[in-house]
Amino acid sequence: AFELFIEKTPPIGKSFLFLDDSNIRKIIKQLKTKNYFTYGFNKNSNYQICNTKYEINFTKFDLKIKNIGSKNFHIKNILLNLIGKHNVHNATAAIALCLNLGLKENVIKKALKNFSGVQRRLTKVFTKNKVEFYDDYAHHPTEIGSVLEGVKAVGKKRKIISVFQP
């Protein structure tokens, strides 16, 4: 079904495919169309995430853009006031889409810098005595794993306690 959806993308449209996902890589091998761009940490991505730095209150990363027509360029120091690898993935997909719509790099970077996230998606509730409390509405194992990975990236030597309500 997903392959058919991509194949039916009209010539004026583009699909943006997450190349870090092994299932997407398998699907790409079977596609007849080239009407898509890829993004992710994978070095073969058209929009490759690199130089990622995870901090307590923000994430900073660069983006190598390659094989987009005759364009190859680098966007440096993209600042997200969010933590977690999943947020970097989502931001990269948004950047790719915005660039394809003709938005300027500085406009995109400013919008991402000012974006504070979605409520209950790794929302910092409070900090007290070096203890941070986050609220997240992850509801399946993949999302829960992404949240824990994001928290671990910024709390490298800190204890993490998770409370889960099924």
Task: List each language-model region with its residue ranges.
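Acidic, Mg2+-coordinating active-site environments of NTP-dependent enzymes
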Residues: 1-133, 153-159
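Switch II (G3) loop of P-loop NTPases
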Residues: 133-139
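Active-site beta-alpha connecting loops in nucleotide-dependent enzymes
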Residues: 118, 142-166
